[in-house]
């Protein structure tokens, strides 16, 4: 008589199953994550599956665990990553993401042939631009706008690789593409280029902060710009760090509604990750940790 036997889970799945049976924990896969994040899902390519152990710390919810960009990996667990210390975030900041490599943010976009084609045709982001950008340190910031047509403004600061001429040529090509799309170019300040609709509403632009540091912005011209010193304040002990104010984001309808209620009601959330370099994971495996504050 034949009988079906389920093959024991291995690797990350096995560890996550064991954690769920023994501790307070959460376990997710790529489908569940995409359902929760909606249109933001392409930016979570590093976190396609994983699990977190939950605990409390002086009124905070903290977690540690692991995530992987590839489903079904059989690698050993990555090194433990301690939860971040409290780092208050105040208005008008809504979100701050710092990373050591821009491809940590963009690899999900580049994996989609439709998005890749759109970015190449409309904004000139072809294979050579992707190749040069992927190793660049970056800071992404979302700030609430109290007035005007936008609920928030977005800034992306990147320390570009050498060859200023290459980037100047790309910005010139991008300018021609934006003009063909009906936008009007302005230069209100030195090294600052803004773009507006025919009705005069500024919708974005860029500014050189230093020889290799460029800030792109969507929305109005930022009231304050990041420093132009030799290095951005990027965390060196992790590969990326995210801070956000979920409650404030929800109030301006910028937080995905399917996120868990405890996240939506939180005053602040911190999440960070460190890639496991070398070994069998091929750079897809991460240690992750975080902190949530309800007050």
Name what the model sees in each region.
Residues 1-17, 139-241:
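Single conserved position on a long alpha-helix in the C-terminal lobe of the eukaryotic protein kinase
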Residues 8, 39-42, 78, 83-84, ...:
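Proline-rich intrinsically disordered, low-complexity coils
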Residues 26, 31-34, 61, 78, ...:
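Short, low-complexity intrinsically disordered segments
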Residues 34-45, 114-130, 187-202, 257-265:
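Generic detector of solvent-exposed, compositionally biased contiguous segments
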